[in-house]
Amino acid sequence: LVLESWCCGGSPLANTHRNPLAVDKPRCAFAVRVAFALVAIPALCNVEVVAAQTGTALRGWALVETLREGGYNIYFRHVATNWSQADRVAEAGDWTSCDPDRMRQLADAGRQTASAIGDAMRALQIPVAHVFASPYCRTVETARLMQMGKIETTTDIMNMRVAEYFGGPSALIERARERLSTLPPAGTNIVLVAHGNVFRDATGVYPKEAEAIVCRPTGKGSYSVVARIPPQAWERLVAEWRSPTRALSPPQPR
């Protein structure tokens, strides 16, 4: 089962490692309206998860249930940064600098977002076994503010702009794919915090700042991209998960 997720009418996610069936947008739009009627959370745009093989729309808490079961790699692009700053890498290791005159750093709004995402993941009780981050200051700080566990830095998910220091683009892309295809310990998930360009080059999907992309690994060198979660969706997922009407709804198909 390949899942695709979007919010507020965003574009469905194209899976670059499988060939899922096309999503029936009108049918999904109708299902969204039904979900709103069942889960009465005023003015909330529900995070929808779509089973691409059947076209069946699932409410956002079905995604939460899936993540609570574990078995996924949750890839975050670092949160919002200050784009008036620029990366100035003259030699290996410069990327670890937290000096805004040398490297682009997080914006204050981004820091608040990282903390809020971490709060939401804990509220949803999504189990995390490991947290890996690119050694860039902005990715490590994002992971630290999320407070999901001990952070281990890895150059396997490095910014493509410094690929020359790590064997070139092809080598870096291959290592990123290996990370995405690695199975987490049973019943848990792995969080990776890195950059948009390496994920784009490895999968064809380009995450926005603070966006989470959920990958289901096989442990056999392959994986599938199953959901995209924009940063503003986490609060909505928590609201829906806590809704008393959730317990009254029938089990959702996987």
Walk through the language-model features, giving the residues of each.
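Boundary at the C-terminal end of the N-terminal hydrophobic targeting segment
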Residues: 45, 50-54
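Generic beta-sheet signal
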Residues: 71-73, 188-194
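Bacterial N-terminal signal peptides
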Residues: 33-46
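A short, acidic, amphipathic alpha-helical segment used as a generic capping/interface helix at domain edges
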Residues: 173-184
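Bacterial N-terminal signal peptides that target proteins for export
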Residues: 17-36
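Active-site-proximal alpha-helix that buttresses catalytic centers in soluble enzyme cores
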Residues: 53-155, 160-164, 205-254
